[in-house]
Amino acid sequence: MFAFGEKVLLIDAKKRRYLFTLKPDGEFHTHSGFLAHSVIVSEQEGAVVRSTKGAEYILLRPTLEDFVIQMPRGAQVIYPKDLAPICMMADIYPGAKVFESGLGSGALSMTMLRQGAVITGYEIREDFANRAQINVREFLGAEALSSYQVHVKDVY
């Protein structure tokens, strides 16, 4: 079952992906009708839900890849096809202490945090630092911020 405040992913018959956060009075709208968030909350992951016009959607929890592709960003994002090799080549493991320079929108940070790294990051732009922290909190939860120390200043 899902809960309000949680992110969900709907996939339609044409494989289009819709990512949004469930809200108590929220509705998901498309040209194919709408779907009340309260209906989604009562369903299990993998269920097929129907809009008011009968359009079918598969209901899933978004993966990190889904979020990275669709997350709000200020800076250019590192895409999932590059995130995995970066983390492998950097040997990121649970408890690894990482120094990250230039946080951007937080895609690399989220990937390393998901693998259990502890990150100290520097970002010269406050808006990018804020966006990265918001994205981490939105997808990984507030508890992930305890492993993510962000400094708004030049790394030099």
Regions found by a protein language model. Give the residues of each.
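Conserved class I S-adenosyl-L-methionine
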Residues: Y93-G104, T120
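Conserved SAM-binding loop of SAM-dependent methyltransferases across substrates and taxa
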Residues: S105-A117
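N-terminal auxiliary segments of SAM/dcSAM-dependent transferases
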Residues: M1-R61
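Gly/Ser/Thr-rich loops at beta-strand to alpha-helix junctions
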Residues: L103-G106, R125-E126
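S-adenosyl-L-methionine
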Residues: A55-I58, L64-P72, Y122-Y156
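Conserved SAM-binding loop and adjacent beta-strand
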Residues: I69-A84
